[in-house]
């Protein structure tokens, strides 16, 4: 495994691979690796000859009142986990990524202004900045992201399309704890009791899916589910939408997604479930 701290190091490495006609799969992370990240590496190995993982806690996607300083960092443990699993790890500092400071604005479009983009308006602009920069440096053939951050996935796909980048964007399924809680680096903030409470998010989303498949009215379902969520969390949003557009479900909808974001204390949790729409859906 080649460990790269500077842009020039990873650039020289990927140039050599491209000259050898090797394909490159890329997984951007902020570290704090868990089984969800490792599942993306498994996908990457199937999609390309070489696998690169980046570890960079991106300050551009944190608001001033968020957890940039306290975000879980475990670089040594992450590198041990990656040692036998990837070909290179890119660990840049802020000056490598933003040599002229964080100033670029990228229009993330409608998809980036709803749901998480509505309550965290800074997030997708900061996220898309760093992803575009990393794509320019690593020049992958394919990049893999987790389904848990589903809205982020769609924003990235839209960016790749808008910029005509020759990069295939793949996604990996949500990996869950035995309780159903979606794995996340921020789960480290949860106490044992909080983790049990957090599992209610997936339970409620699963219930909504079951009822949607029974053709129950979505407006009624949402009110019931929101009431249930508020028994355990501070609710940010709960939506049942077309999975491809994040708009209201229509006759042309093929897949439905149920998305929610909640707060448990100061910890923000997101989750979603995607499923095929029944032919007789009303």
Curated annotation (Swiss-Prot):
Residues given in the record as ATP binding sites: 30-37, 146-149, 175, 183-186
GO biological process terms on file: pantothenate biosynthetic process
Positions of the catalytic residues: 37 (proton donor)
A single GO molecular function term of this UniProt record: pantoate-beta-alanine ligase activity
Xref: Gene3D superfamilies: HUPs, Pantoate-beta-alanine ligase, C-terminal domain
InterPro entries (alphabetical): Cyt_trans-like, Pantoate_ligase, Pantoate_ligase_C, Rossmann-like_a/b/a_fold
Pfam families, A to Z: Pantoate_ligase
Compartment(s) where it occurs, according to its Swiss-Prot or TrEMBL record: Cytoplasm
Record keywords: ATP-binding, Cytoplasm, Ligase, Nucleotide-binding, Pantothenate biosynthesis
Residues that bind (R)-pantoate: 61, 152
Broad enzyme group: ligase
CDD domains in UniProt: PanC
Binding annotation for beta-alanine: 61
Biological or metabolic pathway of the protein: Cofactor biosynthesis; (R)-pantothenate biosynthesis; (R)-pantothenate from (R)-pantoate and beta-alanine: step 1/1
A Gene Ontology cellular-component term: cytosol
EC number: 6.3.2.1
Main location: cytoplasm
Reaction equations catalysed: (R)-pantoate + beta-alanine + ATP = (R)-pantothenate + AMP + diphosphate + H(+)
Domain of life: Bacteria
Family as reported in the entry's similarity comment: Belongs to the pantothenate synthetase family.
Quaternary organization: Homodimer.
Additional note from the record: The reaction proceeds by a bi uni uni bi ping pong mechanism.
Biological role: Catalyzes the condensation of pantoate with beta-alanine in an ATP-dependent reaction via a pantoyl-adenylate intermediate.
Protein name per its UniProtKB record: Pantothenate synthetase
The species this protein was found in: Vesicomyosocius okutanii subsp. Calyptogena okutanii (strain HA)
Encoding gene, per UniProt annotation: panC
């Amino acid at each position: 495994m080649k460990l790269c701290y500077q842009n020039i190091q990873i650039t020289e490495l990927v140039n050599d691979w491209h000259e050898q006609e090797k394909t490159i799969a890329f997984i951007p992370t902020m570290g704090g690796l868990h089984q969800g990240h490792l599942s993306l590496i498994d996908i990457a190995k199937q999609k390309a000859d070489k696998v690169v993982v980046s570890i960079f806690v991106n300050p551009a996607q944190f608001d001033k009142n968020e957890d940039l300083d306290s975000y879980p960092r475990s670089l040594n443990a992450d590198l041990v986990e990656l040692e036998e699993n990837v070909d290179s790890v890119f660990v840049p500092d802020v000056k490598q990524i933003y040599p002229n400071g964080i100033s670029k604005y990228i229009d993330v479009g409608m998809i980036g202004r709803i749901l998480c983009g509505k309550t965290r308006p800074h997030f997708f602009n900061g996220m898309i900045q760093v992803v575009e920069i990393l794509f320019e440096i690593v020049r992958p053939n394919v990049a893999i992201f987790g389904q848990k951050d589903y809205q982020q996935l769609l924003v990235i796909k839209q960016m790749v399309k808008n910029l005509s980048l020759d990069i295939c964007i793949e996604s990996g399924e949500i990996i869950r704890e035995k309780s159903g809680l979606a794995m996340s680096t921020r789960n480290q903030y949860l106490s044992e009791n909080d983790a049990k409470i957090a599992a209610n998010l997936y339970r409620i989303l699963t219930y909504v899916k079951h009822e949607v498949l029974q053709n129950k009215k979505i407006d009624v379902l949402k009110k019931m589910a929101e009431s249930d969520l508020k028994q355990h969390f501070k609710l940010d949003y709960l939506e049942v939408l077309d999975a491809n557009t994040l708009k209201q479900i229509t006759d042309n909808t093929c897949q439905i997604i149920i998305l929610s974001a909640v707060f448990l204390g100061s910890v923000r949790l997101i989750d979603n479930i995607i499923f095929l729409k029944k032919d007789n859906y009303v």
